[in-house]
């Protein structure tokens, strides 16, 4: 099932200013969560309707600080005792609809300059998210001394109570060069595209059970034998394998196969910034292009309607977007250092608002096959 709606939250953000020098701890923030789409039960389109029981998270952008609250019947969530600085406020409220979820979500940036109350309204919009999602991406590498990054992996998760199927699904690493306006392009382009065996959409040979984690490793071996900080991926469920190159095929681990004959390397994920996309695999084609050096190349193109989930990550929050906001409105992994062994994982299991700034957190060690959430 595909993404049917996108996050288009009205952002009420403050202008950039110099970082406040004092951490006074006497600031207050109050946000009122409001829907104007008419989608929330009992609401009317165009008429503001407050949303209670929304989970609201506060994340500092200028220092280490985070907090959570739930909006009351009046739609208000409050945070006090705040040091001066810049903050991002995220809100969400979920409503299950079969195998999908309707999520009311939005965020805004706010500036606390000192003691006193800062109040704002956070307008949410709706997204429909899929039960099958990308739960974790480990990409940054584990050993700076040896530049070791071969222990990369992607983890999927089934957040529903139903058995889903991976047959024919495609995992891609996004083509990094943006051509034209991302929001006017109805497809994603991939520099790497690897496909699960089976028939897309209708296949029933490769299940992912309710609340199951599935790990796809670049190389399904024990990397701690080669890097002191490396991951043991010998128990991975799947392995990326490129039959068009000299890739080593680990016995007894099923393969997710490269579909572009012109790409002869393994599924290598950029160590700093890029995007990983999961698609149904029901439609794709290989297209030719001319690279920045004037040489021809090929890439895989997938229609946007086939996208199940996508996660964009970047070490810097001001990185240029490479994935349309219709798939991911934010960035995971801000602040992630190369070869640190850190990973990005969903903040809460099964929570997807199509905004990785909110959905993902940076964790010091990856959790292949399980989650850091207690």
What name fits each language-model region?
Residues 94-120:
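Structured interaction patches on ligand/partner-binding surfaces of diverse proteins
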Residues 77, 118-120, 214:
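Short strand-edge motifs at loop-to-beta-strand transitions and within beta-strands
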Residues 61-77:
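Short, acidic Ser/Thr/Gly-rich low-complexity loop/linker segments typical of extracellular
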Residues 73, 83-84, 210:
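Surface-exposed loops/turns
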Residues 78-86:
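Short Pro-Gly-centered beta-turn/loop motif in secreted/extracellular proteins
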Residues 15-51, 90-92, 100, 123-341, ...:
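Activation on beta-sandwich/Ig-like modules and their edge loops
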């Amino acid at each position: 099932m595909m993404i049917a709606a996108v996050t288009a939250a009205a952002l009420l953000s403050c202008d950039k200013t110099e970082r406040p020098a004092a951490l006074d701890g006497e600031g207050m923030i109050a946000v009122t969560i409001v829907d104007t789409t008419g989608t929330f039960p009992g609401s009317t389109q165009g008429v503001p309707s407050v949303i209670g029981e929304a989970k609201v998270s506060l994340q500092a952008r200028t220092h280490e600080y985070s907090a959570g609250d739930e909006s009351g019947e009046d739609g208000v969530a409050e945070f006090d005792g705040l040091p001066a600085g810049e903050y991002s406020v995220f809100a969400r409220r979920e409503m299950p609809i079969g195998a999908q979820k309707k999520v009311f979500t939005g965020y805004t940036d706010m500036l606390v300059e000192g003691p006193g109350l800062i109040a704002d309204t956070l307008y949410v919009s709706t997204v429909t998210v899929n039960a099958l999602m990308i739960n974790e991406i480990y990409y940054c590498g584990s050993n700076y001394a040896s530049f070791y990054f071969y222990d990369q992996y992607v983890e999927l998760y089934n957040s529903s109570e139903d058995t889903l199927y991976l047959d024919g699904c495609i995992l891609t690493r996004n083509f990094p060069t943006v051509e034209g306006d991302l929001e006017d392009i109805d497809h994603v382009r991939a520099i790497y595209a690897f496909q699960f065996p089976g028939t897309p959409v209708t296949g029933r040979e490769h299940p992912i059970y309710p609340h199951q984690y599935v790990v796809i490793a670049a190389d399904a071996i024990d990397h701690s034998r080669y890097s002191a900080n490396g991951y043991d991926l010998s128990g991975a469920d799947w392995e990326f394998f490129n039959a068009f190159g000299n890739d080593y095929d680990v016995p007894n681990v099923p393969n997710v196969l490269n579909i572009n004959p012109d790409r002869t390397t393994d599924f290598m994920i950029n160590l700093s910034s890029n995007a990983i996309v999961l698609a149904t695999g029901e439609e794709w084609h290989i297209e030719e292009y001319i690279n920045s050096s004037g040489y021809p190349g090929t890439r895989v193109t997938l229609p946007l309607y086939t996208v199940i989930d996508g996660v964009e990550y970047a070490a810097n929050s001001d990185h240029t977007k490479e994935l349309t906001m219709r798939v991911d409105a934010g960035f995971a992994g801000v602040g992630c250092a190369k070869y640190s062994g850190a990973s990005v994982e969903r903040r809460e299991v099964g929570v997807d608002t199509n905004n990785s700034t909110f959905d993902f957190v940076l964790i010091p060690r990856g959790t292949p096959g399980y989650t850091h959430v207690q």
